[in-house]
A protein has these predicted regions:
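Alpha-helical scaffolding segments of alpha/beta enzyme cores, especially the outer helices
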Residues: 115-118, 122-129, 161-168
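Bacterial Sec-dependent N-terminal signal peptides
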Residues: 1-21
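Helix C-cap/helix->beta junction micro-motif
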Residues: 54, 130-132, 172-173
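Surface-exposed, proline-enriched loop/turn segments that connect beta strands in immunoglobulin-like
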Residues: 225-227
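Active-site segments of SGNH/GDSL-like serine hydrolases
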Residues: 98-104, 125-160
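Conserved SGNH/GDSL esterase-like catalytic core that processes O-acyl groups on lipids
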Residues: 22-27, 32-121, 157
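Short, solvent-exposed loop/linker segments at the N-terminal edge
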Residues: 229-235
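Catalytic His-Asp segment of secreted/periplasmic serine-dependent ester chemistry enzymes
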Residues: 21, 38, 141-218
Length: 235
């Protein structure tokens, strides 16, 4: 009986320690992160596919909110959504942010573009307060295909301006910059509605994040995470 009790306690302690050692990855974003238009976001979204790639030593949280803007005066500010509160409470060791697509809306960018950098820095600071040791990765925007109804009326140009702002933010905030644009750009068919990736497209995003986190670029170079003295675990 004592042996059984000891074994049960030992297994419980091992389970707790194992859970404590999992690297938490918070995926922050809009409908592209959430998995909108996908058959089953719970398994098909890029954060879900990322979980499969990283394995059990990581815990990936999907905190995507459909329609969310980065701009705090936008039509649906991310920092005012429940998903933001949950992401902060999650206190990820790694925070992956992909926001800005919805800010190309004519209600938003033309009126509040001057606040974009300030608002993005505030978002980054919020996650650093929640976990001062977190590593933050921000993504260049996914493409918007030229068949989008507002593509030529402003979306194309505003999308480009936001890309430039994101690159500036990465340098100023000292965070890792990751590219969600180039991997999808040659394949517009992966964006059936001109904005949201299909399952294959979401898989490409998952692999892009996986490479940014683990440094597995097919032997080309290591992720910036290694410069932060962070020990990463492979599943």
């Amino acid at each position: 009986m004592k042996k059984i009790l000891f074994l049960s306690l030992f297994l419980m302690v091992c389970t707790i320690l194992s859970a404590q050692k999992r690297v938490k990855v918070a995926c922050v974003g809009n409908s592209i992160t959430y998995g909108y238009t996908l058959p089953n976001p719970a398994t098909d979204s890029y954060p879900s596919q990322l979980q499969q790639l990283l394995g059990e030593t990581y815990e990936v949280g999907n905190f995507g909110k459909s329609g969310a803007t980065l701009l705090n005066k936008g039509h649906r500010p991310y920092m005012q959504q429940e998903e933001f509160k949950k992401a902060i409470a999650f206190a990820g060791d790694i925070v992956v942010i992909h926001l800005g697509i919805n800010d190309t809306d004519p209600r938003d960018w033309p009126n509040y573009r001057d606040s974009f950098v300030k608002d993005y820095l505030a978002l980054i600071d919020s996650f650093r307060v929640a976990n001062p040791k977190c590593h933050i990765i921000i993504a260049r925007l996914t493409p918007i295909a030229d068949r989008h109804p507002r593509f030529e009326s402003g979306t194309r140009d505003w999308h480009g301006e936001i890309q430039q702002s994101i690159e500036t933010i990465a340098k100023y905030a000292g965070v890792q910059l990751m590219d969600f644009h180039e991997p999808l750009y040659p394949y517009p068919y992966l964006l059936p509605d001109a904005v949201h990736p299909n399952v294959e497209g979401a898989g490409i995003l998952a692999k892009t994040v996986y490479s940014a986190i683990t440094g597995d670029f097919g032997g080309l170079h290591l992720s910036e995470l290694y410069t932060d003295n962070m020990v990463l675990q492979h599943g």
